[in-house]
Amino acid sequence: MKTLVIKRDNRQYQCEVTNGDFFGEANVIIKEIIHPDRKFLRTEVLGYTKTIDLNAYSSILKGVESAVDKYHAEKTREDRIKKMWKEFEEKT
């Protein structure tokens, strides 16, 4: 298992990469780091499977970054929707 920390905007994600069920496949588990100084992890976890070469660090990094980008985009979208809904409720 390999562990990487990737930053996107003002968020940090801890990614654990483990061998998948098939050759050349890896499971990437992403945990958002809420307080980087204390390494407190958000309990919400995204399991993600990506075909990457586990022997090549650049391939692992590229695969993990694409998983984080996808997850980060979803979280950012959710946050925007929550903010818009809150503003709408305050106006009505």
Regions from the PLM with identified roles:
Residues M1-H35:
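Amphipathic, interaction-prone secondary-structure segments
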Residues D37-T92:
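Mixed-charge, Lys/Arg-enriched low-complexity segments
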